[in-house]
Regions:
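Short, Lys/Arg-enriched N-terminal segments with co-localized hydrophobic residues
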Residues: 1-2, 25
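Bacterial N-terminal signal peptides that target proteins for export
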Residues: 2-13
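Bacterial N-terminal signal peptides
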Residues: 12-22
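Sec/Tat signal peptide C-region and signal peptidase I cleavage site
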Residues: 23-29
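Primary mode marks residue(s) on the alpha4-beta5-alpha5 output face of response regulator receiver
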Residues: 30-198
């Protein structure tokens, strides 16, 4: 299977499986309790080994995603920085579970991948209201993040920098201290267009 066919298959699978998931949640801006954050780190620490993540069906999207800080009216504003390489688990469905993120994010460091964050995605089609996790409201709703996720996959998402400090805050989508300089495939993405909530 060629890389472009693999990417198209993966993107289509992301849309299909997430669209079938019933998601719920409410928005609240409270800081998450330290005990819950510690529990998340403990549960997800096994994925510091990316091979364990692959065995648990987290599949790499290959490209290291970063942003130049550009702003565009009507688009989500991402501070200059990177996210990293996303590993997506298409089998995780249902309400956002702090111990089972849909996405693990790795930073390329030399010839290794270092776990830095987790991400949860909620399809707009099944969200009755803005979801939240640990009292943190999700961002969006927004279009899909092309080229990794098709534009038509409207969704909310939330990042949590559990394994690398982020000067912009634990739940900021980008981290200026994450770099894609060691990545074999680097993807400079533009800000994602916001869409209307139902």
């Amino acid at each position: 299977m060629t890389m472009s066919n693999f990417a198209r298959f993966g993107a289509a699978a992301v849309v299909a499986l997430f669209a079938m998931s019933p998601w719920v949640g409410t928005a609240n801006a409270d800081d998450p309790p330290k005990a819950e954050i510690d529990a998340m780190r403990k549960a997800l620490s096994k994925y510091e080994d990316p091979y364990v993540a692959v065995r648990d069906l987290y599949l790499s999207t290959v490209g290291c995603v970063h942003y130049d800080g550009s702003t565009m009216e009507g688009h989500l504003q991402y501070a200059k920085g990177a996210m990293g390489v996303h590993f997506v688990n298409l089998t995780i469905q249902g309400p956002p579970d702090p111990l089972k993120p849909n996405v693990l994010i790795y930073e390329p460091v030399g010839n290794k991948l270092k776990l830095v964050a987790a991400e949860w995605l909620v399809p707009l089609a099944v969200a009755k209201e803005r979801p939240s996790l640990l009292g943190q409201p999700f961002q969006g709703p927004m279009e899909g993040h092309e080229p990794l996720i098709p534009q038509g996959f409207h969704h909310y998402d939330l990042h949590a920098w559990l394994f690398k400090d982020n000067p912009l805050g634990m739940f900021s989508p980008t981290n200026p201290d994450v770099s894609c300089k060691d990545a074999q495939f680097s993807l400079m993405e533009m800000p994602t267009k916001l869409v209307a909530a139902p």
